[in-house]
Swiss-Prot record:
Its EC number is 1.3.1.-. This is Probable tRNA-dihydrouridine synthase. It comes from Rickettsia bellii (strain RML369-C). NCBIfam families: nifR3_yhdG. Its cofactor is FMN. FMN binds at residues 17-19, 72, 141, 202-204, 226-227. It catalyses: a 5,6-dihydrouridine in tRNA + NAD(+) = a uridine in tRNA + NADH + H(+); a 5,6-dihydrouridine in tRNA + NADP(+) = a uridine in tRNA + NADPH + H(+). It is an enzyme of class 1 (oxidoreductase). One of its GO terms (molecular function) is tRNA binding. Pfam families: Dus. Belongs to the Dus family. Keywords: Flavoprotein, FMN, NADP, Oxidoreductase, RNA-binding, tRNA processing, tRNA-binding.
Length: 326
């Protein structure tokens, strides 16, 4: 099993940090389906220090166990990241993850995320500052490099390891690729061979077969599931079962999916409040219903609703119609 410092994961399948997706309630749900580790949404370190309400909400920490309390920080100022890391440790975080992989323009233009891969000197200072600031393990998530000419993830991983970083996750694309093309899992093997700390493969892990292929091609210690978990929080358990037994575990029945969707919907509304919760829940309802009969009509109807009870009734009506078709 994977060990991050003194923390041992129960599974080698990790839920990726995803802005606007991996909030407290989604992490809680996916953890229940067997994720070895769940990571918060990316939080801007400077915003964390000034304690913006949004940043504090993003880092809401699950106290169930250490593998539920991993917070991802972004930023380019070593002292600011260090202070934010210490703040999160004081709030109960058990692992700090550093974002060196986000390709979004607004993040890169602030010289954060994957832009940091272009400055190995600054990267080293950030690693060292974060590790020195806290007693808990610090990890990093990166890409292969900035572009095809600068695939420096193996070098950066070595720098990270020397600085005290305890785990490296690599998305198998460059920043310039964004999410186009296919993730290069074979390249991640170069990172695995460069360091002794755990290496996690990320990118295009959308089903159990791809998870197995990614592990085989990368020789990584585990996989990180991102967009593949949209509307399928149970994917983690399917992958885990397949890797352990070689058997394909079916998705939950539609009846069970209805229970999961209703539970998640209610948790969102309870956590954010009705006015904010309903709009946030809409995207999840869209992902959950994708591929089911008449899902477009369902999504269209839900997107026009603001009353939480009406949305809940619509969810039940939609899934009941799917069940009756079977």
């Amino acid at each position: 099993m994977i060990k991050i410092g003194n923390i041992e994961l129960s599974s080698n399948i990790i839920l990726a940090p995803m802005s606007g997706v991996t909030d407290l309630e989604f992490r809680r749900l996916v953890k229940r389906f067997g994720a070895g580790l769940v990571v918060s949404e990316m939080i801007a370190s400077r915003a964390m220090i000034v304690e913006s309400r949004q940043s504090l909400q993003k880092c809401s920490i699950m106290q169930d166990d250490a593998t539920s309390a991993c917070v991802q920080l972004a930023g380019c100022e070593p002292n600011v990241i260090a202070e934010a890391a210490k703040m999160n440790e004081d709030m109960g975080a058990k692992i700090i993850d550093l974002n060196f992989g986000c390709p979004a323009k607004k993040v890169v233009n602030g010289y954060s995320g994957s832009a940091l891969m272009r400055d190995e000197g600054l990267a080293a200072k950030i690693f060292e500052a974060a590790v020195k600031a806290v007693k808990i393990p610090v990890t990093v998530k990166m890409r292969m490099g900035w572009d095809d000419q600068t695939k420096n993830a193996p070098t950066l991983a070595k720098i990270a390891e020397r600085s005290g970083i305890q785990m490296v996750t690599v998305h198998g694309r460059t920043r310039c690729q964004f999410y186009s093309g296919n993730a290069d899992w074979e390249f991640i093997k170069n990172v695995k061979e460069a360091v002794k700390i755990p290496v996690i493969a990320n990118g295009d892990i959308t089903n159990f077969a791809k998870a197995k292929e990614a592990l085989e091609k990368s020789s990584a210690d585990g996989v990180m599931v991102g967009r593949g978990a949209y509307g399928k929080p149970w994917l983690i358990s399917q992958i885990d079962h397949y890797l352990k037994t070689g058997e394909e575990k079916p998705a939950p029945s539609i009846e069970s999916q209805l229970d999961i969707v209703l539970e998640h919907y209610q948790a969102i509304v309870d956590y954010y409040g009705e006015s904010a919760g309903v709009p946030i829940a809409r995207k999840h309802m869209g992902w959950y219903s994708s591929g089911l009969p008449n899902s477009a009509e369902f999504r269209g109807a839900v997107n026009l609703m603001n009353d939480p009870i009406a949305v809940k009734d619509k969810i039940v009506e939609f899934y009941t119609s799917v069940i009756n078709r079977e």
